[in-house]
Amino acid sequence: MAAHNLKHALFCAIVTLIISYPILGFNLASEGTTVTLEGAKTSTIVGVLLAAVVVFLFQLFRDNLMGSLRQLPAVNPLANRKPMEQSKRLKLESTLLTLMIIGALVWPFIASRGAVDLSTLVLIYIMLALGLNVVVGLAGLLDLGYVAFYAVGAYTFALLSQYYGVSFWFALPIGALLAALFGLVLGFPVLRLRGDYLAIVTLGFGEIIRILLNNMTNLTGGPNGIGGIPDPTLFGMEFGRRVKEEGNTSFHETFGIAYSGEHKVIFLYLIALVLAVITAIAIRRLMRMPVGRAWEALREDEIAAKSLGLNRTAVKLSAFTIGAFFAGFAGTVFASKQGFISPESFVFLESAIILAIVVLGGMGSQMGVILAAIAVTILPELAREFSEYRMLIFGAAMVLMMVWRPQGLLPMRRIHIELKKQE
Amino acid sequence: MQDLLYFIQQLINGLTIGSTYALIAIGYTMVYGIIGMINFAHGEIYMIGAYTALIAITGLAALGIAWLPLILIVALVCAMIVSSSMGWAVERVAYRPVRGKHRLIPLISAIGMSIFLQNYVHLAQGSRNIGFPALIEGGFRFGAEDSFQTSITYMQITIFATTLVCMTILSLFISRSRIGRACRAVSQDLGMANLLGIDTNRIISATFVIGAALAAVAGLLLGMYYGSIDPLFGFIAGLKAFTAAVLGGIGSIPGAMLGGLILGVAESMTSGYLSGEYKDVVSFGLLILILLFKPTGLLGKPEVEKI
């Protein structure tokens, strides 16, 4: 047994060296047309060797380590606790939610401008993640091209405002409905496909939309994007220093206060907050409606759901369309916040980030998804010096999550009725 | 005559690209055939193969070695070793622990791995694209001097020849060798093969290693053909190769070869007659159409849904 372990450990250590040394140990540098090779820093090479030694030792003593780990008493204090009673839990959850919303309402008036701007972005991601949560978490349809619907929402607003001078409030429902229409049109043929084929087809669709946006230069401006997207107005009041459109008044003049750029940022944040809350409530309601139950039934067992008389296509299509609708919402807000959009913002990586949020938070769990969206957007901002490692950590976190805790950080708990024991 | 020569040129270009797609597609199709998952990180393994080959080529040049066959063979061997180790490690770390769970879980794990590997190379080697020396230059030309000439470069011939050799070796390996027979048995029925004493874990590892080695060959060839590489170029190539695998019928090795060639030709015809920008649209569109109308692909077997 020991000899077998040694052989295996040696093999693993060698593989570690092979996969890390050539890539990390040599740096390719190109000067003009010639490519030269430089040795990496000593610290990197020491790190690679150290990693190999760690792998070797771990594999060598793996049986002992695992054995002693299992003998340790359960350190998790929550492991054996009784699940909270359902009515209590629901009460606690709604108290928490109310507190969160109150906190979010007060937040823009105490935080700095940059922080409020970032919070708007967080809210946009929350909307996106909640929408994708319907598709992936509830209906179990892996959509890797979700960003396409986000792009449809954003570009709808940008193009309508550029060509027809449509304002934010008109564009918001149009963008969302158009995104939903795209979802419907795409979903109709592809939802017959099995899970992993669906993933690839949606991914292809996302790429097609991005390539089209990039190449239809005379309509979308191609890679240069569209700029000058107007800010939302409050009952015809504009937030700029000067009124741009006739018939409008400006916010600071109406209320007789000094002009401040912060008003606009706060206003946008509040819009995003309201929309995010609407999204969360709407989806929460949908989850308890027959259609929401049907999503979950289909996710759990397609054949059983079908034999109970559910229309597979209609159920899947409704999830897909509703998910796309909220992505369109988020897209319109995003376009208005940035004032400028280009296909750069709608790459596959964005879809992957939103998916990562849903997966990390716990597929199907709204609270988990919201917390994960906050964490995933804010953590990289806090740790600026590690920002280049952001995606590396993302990828690793997705893998580790699937290996150790596929249900996510805050797994979804089904609403259920418990039978009371008879006295 | 002009038009015919132009057409033939596009055909040759398409077949060149297509044969490398076929090499990458083998990895997808074999893995899918055995454990029924899409190895999303396969494109990254191909990209790592290309980087290793470039590192080996530059290293040999720095040592003053200029004999072309030696450079090519060393680069090929290095790329294959690193890529196959990577393939083995990826399966071990990211796929084996989640094997047998719900379908989406291995897929998400694979996407995570793909992002991880992309950024691993990005951090180690920078995000800019790096020139890949064209080691094989020159070619044959056909047609009148003063008008359009069809050309076949030696590079293209090398790609054809290498692909042909790899495919022949693979076919012989799958049909004749012990591991190859075990591979076929496992892909027919994993549980039964296990009962009959086949170490299925080893066979699955072997599948990943074989697929990764072929992807590394494609990495070296395409790196030389395109003349530059960057950490993101594995993603699109992987997607194309997957399309090729689905087109031919996923799980079927001859299907992957056929699918690769068809896809390559379709792409180069689009660039030749429409516009190069839309070639990706055409290949993804093709993928969507095939999945809609013939999900089993050209040479695939229909799948029976069991309850």
Role assignments for model-derived ranges:
Chain B
Residues 2-20, 127, 152, 173-178, ...:
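Inter-helical junctions in multi-pass inner-membrane proteins, predominant
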Residues 19, 28-51, 100-105, 179-182, ...:
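Short, non-helical or kinked segments that cap or interrupt transmembrane helices
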Residues 148-229, 253-258:
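Helix-loop-helix "hairpin" substructures at the membrane interface of multi-pass membrane proteins
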